[in-house]
């Protein structure tokens, strides 16, 4: 839907405050404006990951739950410094700990945790395995219990009245990972699928990965900014071709 949602004076003032154009920072995490209501989270706890925040007229959507309830709490503090609107929902963009570890905190403040059915099912069956995998490489990572999403979509979905669109293009870094697109700002969030470096391929479908990226490119989304899920966050559309070249160079078993 084009244009901002019409709102009263009070809502407009809150919305204006949300888009003041700066950044806020805590010890290990920062929140920086990308374009309009779209912000990037740089989370430097454990292994650096980048998430997203959308400041809507009636509330906030977080894309990626961050690593743990503690990192989620730190992010929420930064969100409250930008806007007084409540966090409405948090998207688990895949079933791994960096995208779903903060679920317990977000639920505790009344936010809905949103995912595709594929992500929810993988989380239910494989959460103990992925926590153990995380703790093997990061012994300080907590032994987090499973906290499942409570809003589940069978396929692609939209939030914020179409201003945020989540879609699946195929298996890649994980079997279930989704992209999130902000059409008004022409910003694409690449999740763990897109990044500067090759990264962890322990759960990746290396054969299918390039095909997934080709399907993404075939959509011909207008992209001014592509946000990588790890490493440095802000790139142009060339990040897609860059990562496709990296993954194609990986020997296949």
Give the ranges of each region predicted by the language model.
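Bacterial N-terminal signal peptides that target proteins for export
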Residues: 1-12, 20
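Sec/Tat signal peptide C-region and signal peptidase I cleavage site
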Residues: 20-26
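Metallo-beta-lactamase
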Residues: 28, 32-34, 59-61, 67-69, 120-246, ...
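Conserved beta-strand hairpin/beta-sheet module of binuclear metal-dependent hydrolase folds
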Residues: 32-77, 178-192
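Divalent metal-coordination and catalytic microenvironments
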Residues: 37, 54, 64, 79, ...
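Extracytoplasmic/secreted envelope proteins and their assembly/folding machinery
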Residues: 51, 72-76, 100-103, 210-213, ...
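Active-site metal-binding motif and surrounding structural segment of the metallo-beta-lactamase
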Residues: 57-59, 69-114, 219-222
């Amino acid at each position: 839907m084009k244009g901002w949602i019409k709102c009263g004076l009070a809502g407009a003032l809150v919305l204006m405050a949300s888009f003041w154009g700066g950044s806020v920072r805590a010890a290990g995490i920062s929140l920086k404006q990308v374009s309009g209501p779209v912000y990037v989270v740089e989370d430097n706890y454990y292994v650096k990951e980048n998430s997203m925040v959308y400041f809507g007229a009636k509330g906030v959507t977080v894309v990626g739950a961050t690593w743990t309830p503690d990192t989620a709490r730190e992010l929420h503090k930064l969100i409250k410094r930008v806007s007084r609107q409540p966090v409405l929902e948090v998207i688990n963009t895949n079933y791994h700990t960096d995208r779903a570890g903060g679920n317990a905190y977000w639920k505790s403040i009344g936010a809905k945790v949103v995912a595709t059915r594929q992500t929810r099912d993988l989380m239910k069956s494989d959460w103990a395995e992925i926590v153990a995998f995380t703790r093997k490489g990061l012994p300080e990572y907590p032994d987090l219990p499973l906290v499942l999403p409570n809003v589940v979509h069978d396929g692609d979905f939209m939030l914020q009245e179409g201003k945020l669109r989540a879609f699946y293009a195929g298996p890649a870094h994980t079997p279930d990972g989704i992209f999130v697109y902000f059409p008004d700002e022409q910003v694409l969030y690449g999740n763990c699928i897109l990044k500067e470096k090759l990264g962890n391929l322990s759960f990746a479908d290396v054969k299918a990965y390039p095909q997934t990226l080709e399907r993404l490119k075939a959509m011909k989304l207008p992209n001014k900014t592509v946000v990588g899920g790890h490493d440095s966050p802000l790139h142009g559309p060339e990040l897609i071709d860059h990562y496709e070249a990296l993954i194609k160079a990986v020997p296949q078993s």
